[in-house]
């Protein structure tokens, strides 16, 4: 174990050193607009940029003003080197599979995905499930080596787990050990962002090799090699839902939905909030891009799920824009409700009766789910203000909402 720990530290240090060594070259290509394949190593400017770039790497953290309070400049540099370089992450994943191959079983197929349109309560639901101690999942202390969590675990041991409120301003607290929606980085790396276009996120297929790697990835995250089940929150699953089902009809999806105008208003507020944050903090914007979070903010990209795209009629600062997104997403869900392993959950039930809901989900998953202490009802957001809502959108969204409630888990 000692030898493996030292070897893991060596591998991580090599990855970091490699990332640092290529940064000046990347800097050179950025300023000269020359592709990395067409570099002229005989040019004086090439060597000057390497020398200056290397110096910048050393002094940069001492002179750059840190706008991201949660990350030091060195930490941000490490995130950029690893998350922004898919080849490094994928190579580390391949190494991780070889070093920890005993974790990977051929007959593995059971896992649980929590999903929904953003601001539906997916984070609260995922945290509630995780507190039952029946699951394993990714957490903040896996960053930025999200695809080589065991190697990183040999090196990185955060001792403090001080909780702070997340950037959403919704009183949800997080720390190093808090689970988070990080697995989308896996799909970004293995699919080379092919599902991300300039303006939208698009439906796509998962080939067999990628799916098998995904199953291996889930098992590698089980640090304690126990019988826990992989749990993730991933709001982008809708983009590959049908493809994943072709590979595996048995995994469970818990999809949470919320009253349309409430959710649209929450999305609008978060879009304003994160647009401001992203305009002030480039790292915050890069962070969201690396992890595939395009729900709101300056990097917002909607799901391309409907041939009729009414959202183009509205500005993103309009409640009607977000209501059209709600309609498009949940109309798609109505086409999937025949799936016996898709379980619909209403946000109001999560807020009002979390313990009863957890127990009911346990019945559906054939698990005894309960927390150590009963959960208090969640505080819902305050009443909505007067808004200029398109009555046709209101009518359409409420019809879809009423249809969804017919298929939800009854508690």
Language-model features and meaning:
Residues 43-59:
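Canonical hydrophobic alpha-helical transmembrane segment
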Residues 124-134:
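A conserved segment at the C-terminal end of the G1
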Residues 54, 62-106, 268, 275-411:
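PAPS-dependent sulfotransferases, especially Golgi type II membrane carbohydrate sulfotransferases
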Residues 1-18:
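Juxtamembrane interface helix immediately N-terminal to a transmembrane segment
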Residues 29-42:
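Membrane-interfacial hairpin junctions
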Residues 141-231, 300-302:
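PAPS-dependent sulfation machinery
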Residues 233-234, 244-269:
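Conserved phosphate-donor/acceptor-positioning beta-strand/loop module used by diverse small-molecule
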Residues 114:
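Hydrophobic anchor at the beta1->P-loop junction of P-loop NTPases
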């Amino acid at each position: 174990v000692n030898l493996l720990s030292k070897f893991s530290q060596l591998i991580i240090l090599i990855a970091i050193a490699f990332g640092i060594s290529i940064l000046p070259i990347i800097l050179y290509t950025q300023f000269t607009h020359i592709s990395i394949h067409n570099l002229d190593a005989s040019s004086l400017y090439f060597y000057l940029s390497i020398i200056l770039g290397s110096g910048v790497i050393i002094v940069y953290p001492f002179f750059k003003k840190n706008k991201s309070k949660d990350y030091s400049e060195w930490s941000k540099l490490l995130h950029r080197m690893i998350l922004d370089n898919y080849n490094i992450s994928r190579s580390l994943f391949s190494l991780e599979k070889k070093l920890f191959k005993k974790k990977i079983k051929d007959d593995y197929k059971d896992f649980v995905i929590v999903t929904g349109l953003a601001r539906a309560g997916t984070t609260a639901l995922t945290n509630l499930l995780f507190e039952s101690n029946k699951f394993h999942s990714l957490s903040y202390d896996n960053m930025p080596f999200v695809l080589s969590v065991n190697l990183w675990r040999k090196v990185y041991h955060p001792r403090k787990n001080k909780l702070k409120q997340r950037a959403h301003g919704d009183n949800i607290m997080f720390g190093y050990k808090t689970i988070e929606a990080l697995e989308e980085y896996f799909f970004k790396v293995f699919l080379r962002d092919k599902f991300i276009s300039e303006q939208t996120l698009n439906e796509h297929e998962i080939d067999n090799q990628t799916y098998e790697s995904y199953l291996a990835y889930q098992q590698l995250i089980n640090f304690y090699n126990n019988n826990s089940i992989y749990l993730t929150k991933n709001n982008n699953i809708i983009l590959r839902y049908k493809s994943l089902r072709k590979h595996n009809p048995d995994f469970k999806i818990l999809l949470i939905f919320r009253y349309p105008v409430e959710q649209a208003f929450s999305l609008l507020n978060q879009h304003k909030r994160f647009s401001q944050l992203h305009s002030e903090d480039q790292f915050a914007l890069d962070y969201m891009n690396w992890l595939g979070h395009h729900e709101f903010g300056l990097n917002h990209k909607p799901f391309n799920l409907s041939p009729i795209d009414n959202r183009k009629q509205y500005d993103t600062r309009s409640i009607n824009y977000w209501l059209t997104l709600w309609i498009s997403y949940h109309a798609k869900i109505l086409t999937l409700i025949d799936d016996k392993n898709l379980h619909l959950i209403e946000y109001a039930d999560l807020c009002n009766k979390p313990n009863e809901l957890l127990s009911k989900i346990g019945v559906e998953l054939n698990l005894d789910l309960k927390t150590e202490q009963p959960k208090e009802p969640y505080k819902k957001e305050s009443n909505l203000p007067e808004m200029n809502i398109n009555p046709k959108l209101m009518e359409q969204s409420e019809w879809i909402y009423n249809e969804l409630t017919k298929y939800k888990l009854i508690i």
